[in-house]
A protein has these predicted regions:
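Cysteine-nucleophile active-site neighborhood
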Residues: 81-166
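Short low-complexity, flexible loop/linker segments enriched in glycine and/or proline
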Residues: 21-22, 77-79, 126-127
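Phosphate-binding active sites in nucleotide-utilizing proteins
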Residues: 35-38, 44-115, 119
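C-terminal lobe/tail of nucleotide-utilizing enzymes
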Residues: 1-62, 66-74, 141-166
Length: 166
């Protein structure tokens, strides 16, 4: 004897998931022409930036949250973060930063999106405590420094690859 007010049907809607509330992170890897490891940051944001890559059958996109899952990817992507300094320190503490740096040293490709891009630089400073007050050393892969201010400014940036081999 259960009272039922109504039934809500399930419809698969192809709309963006909310940050971190998704089945994507449970997705099993598949065989593809290129292996892409996306770092599963604890405070990941805008992970839907990766969705176009997931839609390409020839790409094996996997989300990595520890060194045992890292494998031997062709490309590593560090996505955006809601707290860049905390997530960089998390990668440093669990060994993922070292894995990424070794991958880059072997000629592997590393991309950073938003906060991930900032992590690839020389340093990240947050003098006002916009995210987490203090200054930390970046991964040192790009000649950039980041200084957070109370008011965020978003600007488009473009660049060119100097020379890509392979």
């Amino acid at each position: 004897n259960t009272s039922v007010l109504g039934v809500i049907p399930y419809f698969h809607l192809d709309i963006e998931d909310e940050d971190s509330l998704t089945e994507r992170f449970r997705k099993k890897s598949r065989s593809g022409l290129a292996k892409i490891a996306v770092i599963r940051l604890p405070r990941i944001s805008n992970f839907t930036d990766i969705a176009p890559l997931e839609a390409v059958d020839e790409l094996d996109v996997s989300y990595v949250s520890n060194i045992s899952q890292f494998g031997d990817p062709d490309v590593v992507i560090i996505p955006g973060s809601k707290n860049t300094i905390s997530d960089l320190l998390w990668m440093r503490q669990n060994g993922l930063e070292g894995k990424i740096l070794r991958h880059a040293a072997k000629g592997g490709i590393v991309f950073g999106i938003c906060g991930g891009y900032q992590m690839l630089g020389q340093s990240i400073s947050d003098p006002t405590g916009a995210e987490q007050k203090g200054t930390v050393r970046g991964m040192g892969l790009l000649p950039v420094t980041t200084v957070f201010e109370q008011e965020k400014r978003r600007t488009r940036v473009s660049g060119r690859f100097a020379k890509v081999g392979g």
